[in-house]
Amino acid sequence: MIILKNENEIDLMRKAGKILGETLNLLKEKVRPGITTTELDRIAEEFITKHGATPSFKGLYGFPASLCISVNNQVIHGFPGSYELKDGDIVSIDCGVCLNGFHSDAARTFGVGNISEEAEKLIRITEESFFKGIEKAYVDNRLTDISNEIQQYVEANGFSVVRDFVGHGIGRKVHEDPEVPNFGRPGRGPKLMAGMVLAIEPMVNMGSYRVKTLDDGWTVVTADGKLSAHYENTVAILPNGPEILTLIK
């Protein structure tokens, strides 16, 4: 069941989203060769709790950390450890923040030091595909209008969208209905309505869209070992169009 949010609830999510956007901006400054993924997790959790909120992911389904940190061919759900980021890596950081009972969810992919032109393009196209998608995030459009726009843009640029994992509704729970795929034919799925809040999150692979899960039960990697990027924001569907709740310029 899709749960519509009223103006007050969206305002609460806006506040959670602001903390999350600021967290990701801080992490962007901290990403550098030599820093461990555990240190990034510590920085994020400290910043979130200092602002009176809690990390949404820690303990969710038994997840052990505040951040999902996925490096290079890792797609999503990597968890922090002793790995030191290296020059040329790309790192996807996915984070959630809960404030006053409402969640926000967002992800960014950053280059570490000097990265290849192809890796830069992958990160850029992944981010741009999100913004292409939300051009369709208007009342009375269909959910897969967003999905199709993302897929068309990604594939036109020579990359592929992950199909085994999708975006989702969000609110009092991190994961709510509906599922928000990044692929599919337009004109399908539920009609978009004012009060929907969606976590829209293109996951884009340099090679095949196929993925697999490692033996740790969490970390999802590309099946062909090629790079993957992830970009996500929490988006409210309002009567006059979409509002991104987790993007702080």
Curated annotation (Swiss-Prot):
Domain of life: Bacteria
Binding of a divalent metal cation 2, residues: 105, 168, 201, 232
Species: Clostridium perfringens (strain 13 / Type A)
PANTHER family: METHIONINE AMINOPEPTIDASE
Alphabetized InterPro entries for the sequence: Creatinase/aminopeptidase-like, Pept_M24, Pept_M24_MAP, Pept_M24A_MAP1
Cofactor binding mode and count: Binds 2 divalent metal cations per subunit. Has a high-affinity and a low affinity metal-binding site. The true nature of the physiological cofactor is under debate. The enzyme is active with cobalt, zinc, manganese or divalent iron ions. Most likely, methionine aminopeptidases function as mononuclear Fe(2+)-metalloproteases under physiological conditions, and the catalytically relevant metal-binding site has been assigned to the histidine-containing high-affinity site.
Protein name stated in the entry: Methionine aminopeptidase
Family: Belongs to the peptidase M24A family. Methionine aminopeptidase type 1 subfamily.
Name of the gene: map
